[in-house]
């Protein structure tokens, strides 16, 4: 690679009429020169993805997947910083060879606002316009943290939840959905009934996917699920807390079937929620397999 000396750069600037002469190069002049040269260079490079495709096959979704990006969230409990994985796609018409992949990342680099459902809608609309498409979809997945208070000692600690928000636009119509995975404790009613000394219990993952006519907060979904578990989980417990959660789970046994039915009943009662799926996976402590249940509504 040939490196230009300072005198060579000055000569180029003088030839292009950007800097008339002298030995010092002001930053503004150099920036102007580089911008002009960059545009000239781009005009000489073939734009292959904008060429015409002859196979007559549209692509439903094309874009980037698993872009890791720092974001801030606007939640009921304030602003929270986290790291998200994004999948950003648009519809590609049959006659167009390819989409402009760099524009997806460029769009994220321009946005510094805290993410909520309103911001997700704006971001999706901007993406569709920027890529000159009729439809597009953005999925944002991230760990969500909530400060929880231990039931006896009152000590506070963080617990993490997996959350995904999705915004989708097609021909001007927009819709969004949310998915939250909530870890809880479940205790087996049958084991309690037949055992003299206790009952087997385990950690369970309850996943709620929903669409709503009005915004439903992440914290609200978490509350719906934790209220129906044998017991909640906590990041940090002292011995009095451990005694409490053990006994609470024992007093509130739930089959995996009970878990999904009770959570579904709570969601149906919320008139903002239009449709949902509830799944529960119990990581059975006495088996090498999980118990699983699923309800879709309506």
From Swiss-Prot:
Site, May be catalytically important: residue positions: 188
InterPro entries linked: GTP_cyclohydrolase_FolE2, GTP_cyclohydrolase_FolE2/MptA
Gene Ontology terms describing biological process: tetrahydrofolate biosynthetic process
Secretion signal, residue range per the UniProt entry: none
Pathway(s) this gene product operates in, as recorded in its UniProt entry: Cofactor biosynthesis; 7,8-dihydroneopterin triphosphate biosynthesis; 7,8-dihydroneopterin triphosphate from GTP: step 1/1
Gene Ontology MF term list: GTP cyclohydrolase I activity
Top EC class for this record: hydrolase
Similarity field: Belongs to the GTP cyclohydrolase IV family.
Protein name as catalogued: GTP cyclohydrolase FolE2
């Amino acid at each position: 690679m040939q490196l230009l000396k300072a005198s060579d750069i000055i000569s180029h600037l003088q030839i292009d009429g950007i800097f008339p002469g002298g030995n010092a190069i002001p930053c503004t002049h150099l920036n102007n020169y580089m911008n002009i040269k960059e545009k000239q260079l781009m005009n000489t490079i073939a734009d292959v993805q904008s060429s015409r495709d002859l196979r007559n096959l549209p692509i439903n979704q094309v874009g980037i997947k698993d872009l890791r990006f720092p974001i801030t969230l606007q939640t009921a409990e304030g602003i929270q910083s986290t790291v998200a994985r994004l999948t950003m796609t648009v519809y590609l018409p049959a006659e167009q060879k390819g989409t402009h992949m760099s524009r997806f990342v460029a769009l994220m680099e321009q946005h510094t606002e805290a993410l909520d459902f309103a911001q997700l809608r704006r971001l999706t609309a901007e993406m569709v316009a920027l890529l000159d498409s009729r439809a597009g979809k953005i999925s944002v997945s991230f760990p969500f943290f909530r400060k929880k208070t231990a039931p006896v000692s009152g000590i506070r600690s963080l617990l993490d939840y997996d959350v995904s928000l999705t915004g989708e636009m097609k021909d001007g119509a927009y819709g969004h959905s949310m998915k939250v995975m909530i870890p809880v404790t479940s205790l087996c009613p049958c084991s309690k009934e037949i055992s003299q000394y206790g009952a087997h219990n385990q950690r369970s993952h309850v996943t709620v996917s929903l669409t709503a006519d009005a915004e439903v907060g992440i914290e609200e979904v978490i509350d719906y699920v934790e209220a129906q578990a044998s017991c909640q989980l906590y990041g940090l417990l002292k011995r009095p807390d451990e005694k409490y959660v053990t006994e609470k789970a024992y007093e509130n046994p739930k089959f995996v079937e009970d878990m999904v039915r009770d959570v579904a009943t709570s969601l149906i009662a919320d008139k903002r929620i239009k449709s949902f799926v509830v799944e529960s996976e119990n990581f059975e402590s006495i088996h090498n397999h999980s118990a699983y249940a699923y309800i879709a509504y309506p």
